Regions:
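Short helix-capping segments at alpha-helix termini
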Residues: 19-24, 51
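Short, well-ordered coil/turn elements that cap or connect secondary structure elements
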Residues: 20-22, 78, 161
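Hydrophobic helical membrane-anchoring modules
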Residues: 118, 142-212
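A conserved acidic beta->alpha catalytic loop
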Residues: 3-12, 62
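Acceptor/aglycone-binding surface of glycosyltransferases and processive sugar-polymer synthases
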Residues: 28-49, 54, 66-149, 176-193
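Alpha-helical transmission elements in cytosolic ATPase-linked domains
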Residues: 9, 13-16, 42, 71
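Short beta-to-alpha linker loops that shape the active-site pocket of alpha/beta-hydrolase fold enzymes
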Residues: 5, 89, 172
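Short beta-strand/loop segment that forms part of the nucleotide-sugar
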Residues: 1-6, 28-29, 58
């Protein structure tokens, strides 16, 4: 768990649970809100340093069902994927309890990203994924520049340009029952214009390649 000074008592709860799960539950505490992307990068680096072969990312509010974790793992371990994506849109629209406006914005945002970047991925903004460690070792994590929701797009696009296999696994996304989304106009703007920046940068950037 990457904890950025949340005011809801998360760190205290985790510390209590760590006494029960000392070899399974870990937490990195950071000062202030440093952004979604930097939190994931911090977690990825920790996982690589501790020699994990498969690294997952997911929301902590149960919008992503932990029961789907073995399916993402199986896609990477046994079905040839380098990155397994828990996809809301690969078999239609599998989202529960979102307002129709939010569903449409997310769905067409993924369509937009797919069109601009040329990735054959239905859910380009998904945040439920499993990576083989080789992916995170190859894509130069310190070169990932976006901190908001565009981070999710940048990670997929970079892995794609490096030659890794991305596979979508259908899931049902259930909106959180408590709390509120952190989506804002600024985050949406970063994602919209960030996609164009990613495409333009890809014309001149030399991406590291997957080892065969």
């Amino acid at each position: 768990i990457i904890e950025d000074g949340s005011p809801d008592g998360t760190s205290e709860i985790v510390k209590t649970m760590q006494t029960e799960f000392p070899t399974q539950l870990f937490m990195i505490e950071r000062k202030g809100k440093l952004g979604l992307g930097t939190a994931y990068i911090t977690g990825f680096k920790w996982a690589l340093a501790h020699n994990y072969e498969y690294i997952f990312e997911m929301d902590a509010d149960f919008s992503h069902n932990p029961k789907d974790l073995p399916r993402l793992y199986d896609a990477c371990a046994n079905m040839g994927a380098d990155v397994a994506i828990g996809s809301r849109y690969v078999t239609g629209v599998n989202v529960v309890n979102w307002p129709i406006g939010r569903v449409l914005m997310s769905y067409f945002a993924s369509k937009y990203v797919r069109f601009v970047l040329g990735m054959n991925i239905a859910d380009t903004t998904a945040g439920f994924k499993c990576y083989r460690r080789e992916v995170l070792e190859t894509i130069e994590l310190d070169q990932i520049r976006f901190k908001g929701y565009a981070f999710q797009v940048e990670m997929k696009f970079t892995a794609y340009k490096c030659g890794f296999v991305l596979k979508e696994v259908p899931i049902i996304f259930i909106n959180r029952e408590l709390g509120t989304s952190k989506m804002s106009g600024g985050i949406f703007g970063e994602a919209f214009f960030g996609v164009i920046q990613l495409k333009m940068n890809s014309w001149v950037r030399k991406f590291p390649k997957k080892k065969i």
